[in-house]
C-alpha cells in the first residue's frame, strides 16, 4: 500500500461529536505509524426552511428553522495494512457519517 492516500470525509449535525470522532481517527492512524493531514474543517452547510405559523391564513407570520451540517476532511498518507485494519475496527458515534476514498 505504498504511495497511497486514504481520504476520510466526516459529516455530522453536532460539531462536538464530529471533532471527537476526527480525533479518534487521527489518534488511531498515528499509533499505527501513518502520516496524517487534518482534520481540515470544510464549509458548514446551512439548510433553512421557512413555514407559515398558522395553518390557514396570516401569510406575514412565518417561522424559520435551520439545520447545520458540519464537515471535516482527514488525509492518511501512506497507510499500512495495520492502519487500515485499525480504522475498520474503530467504533464511532451513530450521528457521524463517514465517506472513505482510497
Curated annotation (Swiss-Prot):
An example Gene Ontology molecular-function term: tRNA binding
Keywords: Ribonucleoprotein, Ribosomal protein
Gene3D superfamilies with a match to the protein in the record: Ribosomal protein S10 domain
InterPro entries to which the protein is assigned, alphabetical: Ribosomal_uS10, Ribosomal_uS10_CS, Ribosomal_uS10_dom, Ribosomal_uS10_dom_sf
Keyword Ribosomal protein: yes
GO CC term (a single one): ribosome
One BP annotation, GO: translation
Family, similarity comment: Belongs to the universal ribosomal protein uS10 family.
Primary role: Involved in the binding of tRNA to the ribosomes.
SUBUNIT field: Part of the 30S ribosomal subunit.
NCBIfam families: PRK00596.1 (NF001861), rpsJ_bact (TIGR01049)
PANTHER family documented for this protein: 30S RIBOSOMAL PROTEIN S10 FAMILY MEMBER
Name of the protein in question: Small ribosomal subunit protein uS10
Source organism of the structure: Clostridium acetobutylicum (strain ATCC 824 / DSM 792 / JCM 1419 / IAM 19013 / LMG 5710 / NBRC 13948 / NRRL B-527 / VKM B-1787 / 2291 / W)
Recorded name of the encoding gene: rpsJ
Amino acid at each position: 500500500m505504498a504511495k497511497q492516500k486514504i481520504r476520510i470525509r466526516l459529516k455530522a449535525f453536532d460539531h462536538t461529536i464530529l471533532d471527537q470522532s476526527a480525533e479518534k481517527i487521527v489518534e488511531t492512524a498515528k499509533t499505527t505509524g501513518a502520516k496524517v493531514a487534518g482534520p481540515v474543517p470544510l464549509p458548514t452547510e446551512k439548510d433553512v426552511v421557512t413555514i407559515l405559523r398558522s395553518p390557514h391564513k396570516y401569510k406575514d407570520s412565518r417561522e424559520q428553522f435551520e439545520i447545520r451540517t458540519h464537515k471535516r476532511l482527514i488525509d492518511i498518507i501512506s497507510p499500512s495494512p495495520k492502519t487500515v485494519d485499525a480504522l475498520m475496527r474503530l467504533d464511532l458515534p451513530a450521528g457521524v457519517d463517514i465517506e472513505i476514498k482510497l
